[in-house]
Amino acid sequence: MAKKNKARLLVKLLSTAGTGFFYVRSRPKAAPKLAFIKYDPKIHKRVLFEESKMK
């Protein structure tokens, strides 16, 4: 079995439109917080997704 890479984190990208829709991505631990403009299917628009805590 392969070893997991400990230098990366799984992060949740939550929609700033307030719909509750999210994407899960991985990023290096040393990198700054992620923010992307991606498609939110609940409102049928592209909106900003910002990193939030995974539960």
From Swiss-Prot:
Main location per the UniProt record: mitochondrion
Keyword Ribosomal protein: yes
Protein name per Swiss-Prot or TrEMBL: Large ribosomal subunit protein bL33m
Family affiliation: Belongs to the bacterial ribosomal protein bL33 family.
Keywords, ordered alphabetically: Mitochondrion, Ribonucleoprotein, Ribosomal protein
Gene Ontology MF term list: structural constituent of ribosome
Gene Ontology biological process terms in this record: mitochondrial translation
Localization of this protein: Mitochondrion
